[in-house]
Amino acid sequence: RDRLSVTRLNDGRLKIKFTDQLLDEVIAESLRHISRKHDAYKIQVECEELILAHMDVRLIIQVLVNLIDNAIKYTPQGSTICIRGLRTDGRAQISVEDNGPGIADEMKSHIFEMFYTGKTTIADSHRSLGLGLALCHSIIEAHEGELTLKDNYPHGCIFVFTLPLSEVTLNE
C-alpha cells in the first residue's frame, strides 16, 4: 500500500486535499492512532498554540504516525519521545525526537529512499525503515515542505518536517 501511495504521489495521481488545520489538534489525532502502542513510553507534546498550517490532514497524520511508530520501535521501553510543534521562518515545524540507538552516519543519506532498510546483516539492530520514510518524504515534498533527520545527542534521532502556514490569521 505504501509503494502505491509513493508512486501515486510522485506522479501526481494522488489527489491532495488541502485545508487549514490547527497543529496541536493534528498531533493529538495522530496520537489517538497509536494509543495502544505507546503505553510503555512517555510521549511528551510541546506545541505552540494556534499554529494554523495548510495541509492534507489525512496525509500529515500518516506522516506523524509513521515517525512516532518508528520512534517507539527503536527506543527502549520507558523512554520519552518528544513531539514539538512551533512556528519558525514563516513555516510550521514539527519534530519527533527519540533517544534510541540513532542512525549510522553512512546510512543517513539513504534513509528517504524507497526500499532502503538500513540493514547490512540480519543481526544488525539498525533501523528497518523500508517504504515508510520514503512515503513520508514524498508527502512532505507534496506539501512544499522539507523532512530532515538530525542527531539527538547523546543518541537518538530527531525527524523534523515543515509545512506552510495558513494564510488565514486567527484572532487570539
Go through the PLM ranges and name each one:
Residues A71-I72:
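Short helix-loop "hinge" at the ATP-lid/N-box region of the Bergerat-fold HATPase_c
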Residues G132, C136:
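Short alpha-helical Gxxx[C/S/T] motif in the catalytic ATP-binding
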